[in-house]
Amino acid sequence: MNNFLESKMRQSGEKWIKGIQKLLTPKRLAALLTVVYVISLMPLLWIAKYNYPSADDYTNGSRCHQIWEMGGSVFRVMGEALLRTVDEWFTWRGCYTSSFLSALPPNIWGDNLYFLTPWLVLLMLSGSMLYLLHEILVKAMKADQYTSHSISMLVLLITVQCLYEQGRVEAFYWYSGAINYTFVYGLSLLFYGLLISAGYAKGKKRTVRLIMASVLGFLTAGGNQMTMLNTAIVLLVMIGIMTYRKKWQEHLGLLLPIGTFFVGFVLAVIAPGNFVRAGAAQGMNPIKAILVSLYGCLDLAVDEWTSWPLIVMVIAMVPLFWHIAEKSDFTFRYPVVVVLFGYGLVSAMLTPPLFALGNMEAGRIQAMLFFMYVLVLTLCVGYITGWAQKKYHPCSEINEKAGIWCLLGCFAFLLFGSLITVIPEPHYYSATSAMTDLLNGSAGVYGAEQRGRTELYHDRSNDMVEVDDFSEKPSLLFFSDITADENDWTNKGVARFYDLETVVIKKDE
């Protein structure tokens, strides 16, 4: 009797699994995860209508804004941004791409356009990640496009939604932080993707990709120092591998974008402004910065970055990577080397802020580190999974069943865990944080108070403006504010932007 019942239960379970297999095809899984990701972005983009500039947005964009207000053309504004870039290269920093982009916050064209900041940054982050992973998984590893897309969606969900609260405003909503770090990070991903694409393309397609990669390489080299250093390390390792394997004859054209990047790299490093800025900061010596980076990477990975949703979603990627490895002729022979390189690459990203500033506390820096950690962790897990598949070769039928159970278990646990997490911690995910501030009204109140301030700034009847402090400061939108001191640099920046004499917050009576 027991054997009969066990047999029936086994048959019923097998039928259920086969039904799930037919339902959960790679194409449908990719579509489902895409819908989930797009839905998760909606609150982040909706709350953007209450987003307003602060701090460096005013100081960096004031001159371009004044030219535009005086009836200047777009070309004159761009020319002013270029002049500012040259001036900063001599007097403040060598990151020419960041200097140029920083001079063009959306509010220089109109205060009501600042909502575009998260749209622009999230589009760049999403598009560049999709493109890079497609080139790695589909072009290099011969994966099917649907499995590759599913992995990309999981990576983006982790990257955007699991970023901890302190980094979100600077990574997505504050233009001066988002454009210099998240956007430039996206440029580097596009650069990597174009290098891979050019390596596999032929004829005119290769020429076009090499030219595009050369432009992006130069722009990436002029971005923030964290991205610049990481890209240089990746390219040097690539040069070493291609030289060792004698691949230059068939990929000689790659020297153009690589060379263009290093021309920009040298241009950014030798800038006189770097030495001026270094004199105003107290950073660590190079050896200490490297050692602290190696420790800091491990410390952050354990204490900050590796949340339970990240672990669950990475586990969900394992059967997808296994499926890719089954059909790939890639050998995955060096898992230890790849993991160590990944650890070194993420650690290296900590070194520039430690060397230049002596700390890495800024939210935008923390966000960049998290983005890189998620990408490197994903690729390392994929490589180790591929190595295990090639080494042990379990039968494909068991693989498929185990993969289905793994995916279902991960998604069920993620859904249940998220429900019981966001109730006591509504700001746990980026999307739920946005929904919380939208539903409780704090975002709307903040937006209304910002609009009231803007009206006062544009009122030419008084050049000495006093404004009330904000009654609400939504966690996703509020970065910093002016003070009661008219000589504070943030106050001066706002006053200069709107051509006022002074701007202050009213002192408490």
Map each language-model feature to its residues.
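Short, Lys/Arg-rich, polar N-terminal cytosolic tail immediately upstream
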Residues: M1-L23
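Short hydrophobic alpha-helices at membrane interfaces in multi-pass membrane enzymes
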Residues: S197-L219
